Structures are given as structure tokens and as C-alpha cells.
């Protein structure tokens, strides 16, 4: 597909990122990148999500010459510990137990490749309520946490876990919209609100 047909390619399989980007009425297609998402030893959360977003963007840009390629990656950090996606309900409950009653950071790396190269990382601080074992067990077994960094979806059932958010809520969902729009504007992407 050439750049005239598709100006922006979203390098993500995440339905949440697709939904967030679609809210902006920006025309795009999706082409997921399959990369190794294992953190490097001692890699900080900011460096980790920035690296993964860049790698995803470059893999997909090689398949779509001439297009802008947008990629993102999100992780939850509790101190230096990175909390990715739980493998099962038991691991989800263990993550929720660690997050209960505490403040953690959600980092999303956003990278643009192809016509414009730039990477940014956005941090949002999220505080969980003190959760009962029953709440954690119910939520962990609901199925919702299994494909979510940190084992929760703030935009879904998991919203009841949260006592407060400092920063971008869309960042916690997987794509910080304000920062992403600013990035696309800097790149010169034709956006719906710009005069033709």
C-alpha cells in the first residue's frame, strides 16, 4: 500500500490504541509488529517503552515505505519493578496485591518512523484504593486483566480499583492523545482540523 492511500500506519495490535486514535478522525491502517518484548537487564521503564515503541515503528516502516508509522508500548512500574501483562489470573492477582493502596507509574513510549523520526515517553501516576482480597480475586478472575500491563484496565471494570490519576488517563489506556497529536503535528501529518 503506498503513502497516498494510507498516510498513517498504526504499528499495534491493541484494540485500545485503535479506538483512541480513531476518536481523532485520523485515517489510518493497522499493521502489527512482532518483536521480542523482553526487558534488558536493569532497563528502566522509560528506556524500555521508548525502545520497544521505536523497534515496532521501524519494523512496520520497513513494510510501508513513504508512510508515517506510529507505534506505542505501555508498561506499569512499581518502583524499579516492571509489571507487564499477566499470564493468568493468579499472576494478575499477585500484581493487584502489589499495587493495592499504592501509587505506581504508567509509562507509554510513542514512536513515529518513516517520514519523521521521533520518540517520546509519557508518565502518568496512578493510585489504587486499598483493595480487599475479594475485590482482587473477583477482578483477577474476570478475564479483563489478562492482556493489560499491570493487570488492570482503567477504562473498564478496573476503573473501580483506582483512587486517583495524575496525568493523562489516555496514557494509562495505551496512547497519550495530547502528546500523540503534538507529535503528529510536528511531523507534518495532514490532520482533520488543519486547513487543506
From Swiss-Prot:
Function: Nucleoside triphosphate pyrophosphatase that hydrolyzes dTTP and UTP. May have a dual role in cell division arrest and in preventing the incorporation of modified nucleotides into cellular nucleic acids.
InterPro entries for the chain: ITPase-like_fam, Maf-like
UniProt-listed Pfam families: Maf
Catalytic residues of the enzyme: 73
Taxonomy of the source species: Bacteria, Pseudomonadati, Myxococcota, Myxococcia, Myxococcales
Cofactor or coenzyme needed: a divalent metal cation
EC class name: hydrolase
Keyword entries, A-Z: Cytoplasm, Hydrolase, Nucleotide metabolism
Name of the protein in its database record: dTTP/UTP pyrophosphatase
Gene Ontology BP annotations: nucleotide metabolic process
A single cellular component GO annotation: cytoplasm
Family matches, as NCBIfam families: maf (TIGR00172)
Site (Important for substrate specificity): 16, 74, 155
Entry-linked SUPFAM superfamilies: ITPase-like (SSF52972)
EC numbers, comma separated: 3.6.1.9
Entry similarity comment: Belongs to the Maf family. YhdE subfamily.
Predominant location category: cytoplasm
Cross-referenced Gene3D superfamilies: 3.90.950.10
Protein location: Cytoplasm
Catalytic reaction list: dTTP + H2O = dTMP + diphosphate + H(+); UTP + H2O = UMP + diphosphate + H(+)
GO molecular function terms noted in the UniProt entry: dTTP diphosphatase activity; UTP diphosphatase activity
Native source organism of the sequence: Myxococcus xanthus (strain DK1622)
Amino acid at each position: 500500500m503506498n503513502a497516498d492511500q494510507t498516510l498513517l500506519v498504526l504499528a499495534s495490535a491493541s484494540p485500545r490504541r485503535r479506538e483512541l486514535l480513531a476518536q481523532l478522525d485520523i485515517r489510518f491502517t493497522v499493521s502489527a509488529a512482532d518483536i521480542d518484548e523482553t526487558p534488558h537487564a536493569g532497563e528502566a521503564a522509560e528506556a524500555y517503552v521508548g525502545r520497544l515503541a521505536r523497534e515496532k515503528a521501524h519494523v512496520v516502516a520497513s513494510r510501508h515505505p513513504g508512510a508515517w508509522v506510529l507505534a506505542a508500548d505501555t508498561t506499569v512500574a512499581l518502583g524499579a519493578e516492571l509489571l507487564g501483562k499477566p499470564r493468568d489470573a493468579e499472576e494478575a492477582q499477585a500484581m493487584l496485591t502489589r499495587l493495592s493502596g499504592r501509587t505506581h507509574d504508567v509509562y507509554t513510549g510513542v514512536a513515529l518512523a518513516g517520514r519523521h523520526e521521533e520518540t517520546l515517553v509519557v508518565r502518568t501516576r496512578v493510585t489504587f484504593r486499598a483493595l480487599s482480597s475479594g475485590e482482587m480475586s473477583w477482578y483477577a478472575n474476570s478475564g479483563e486483566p489478562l492482556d493489560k500491563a499491570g493487570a488492570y484496565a482503567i477504562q473498564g471494570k478496573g476503573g473501580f480499583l483506582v483512587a486517583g490519576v495524575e496525568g493523562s488517563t489516555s496514557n494509562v489506556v495505551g496512547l497519550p492523545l495530547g502528546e500523540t497529536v503534538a507529535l503528529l503535528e510536528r511531523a507534518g501529518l495532514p490532520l482533520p482540523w488543519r486547513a487543506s
